[in-house]
Amino acid sequence: MRRRFVGALAVSEQISRTENNAMPDFGSWGTAWWKPLLFIIVAGHITNVCVTLFLHRSQMHRSVKFHYLAALPMRLWLWLSTAIVTKEWVACHRKHHAFADRDGDPHSPLLEGLRNIVLKGAFYYRAAVRQPGVLEKYGKGTPNDWIERALLTPLNWLGILLMLAVDLYLFGFFVGPIVWGVQMIWIPFWAAGIINGVGHALGYRNFEVKDESRNISPIAIWLGGEELHNNHHADPHSATFKAKWYEFDIGWVYIRLLSLFGLAKVQYARGSSRG
């Protein structure tokens, strides 16, 4: 009787192992606290860089052209991490430049208050792109290829669900949703909130322009170079946001590196071809 019980237990354990091996390895990166933190930081910086290089400098201001092999990965990453539709983002930002800190600006802290822009910047963005005629007037010239028409625009929600699946697989059912949640508020906070809010309220100015844009920091790394916001508003079509010798624009560094491999072509840069 004892032998039969032990044998049945062994068979049960073997079946359990087989079933477990057949299941996806959720939490495959383990439980070390620093792993999800590192992932958030690296993924967040990549998102910031894709926004400033592809959406802002290339699509919005036409200051740099990217080879398809460079542009497509950035477009796909933004699809996965933000659900941003290129035409909507470009239209909103062009309207911002047309009415910077005046009536009509979609996200001015002078009009709406700094706290509102920092905390609710994404809501102002959505309200702007839903206004009749905004996309038609300000969203011209953005990609209209097959992948945009079939996937990135009509199924923009699908990318962030795939990212959720990745986060669940890497970090499990508890930490994974937290990582995903941080990714989902990343651009609404850092771009719509900090750049468009703090970048028009706090910081230093190299140039007297018609709006209240400010440089948040002379060393522009975390936000891909967008910290140099006053420099950008003074010369919006420049591929480099650096204006002084002591300033650093990491976005410009990435552009120069891509140029070395024939993946980027600068159309205009402040000062000279080397920025």
Where are these regions (language model features)?
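Active-site-proximal inter-transmembrane loops
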Residues: 139-146, 202-228, 232-235
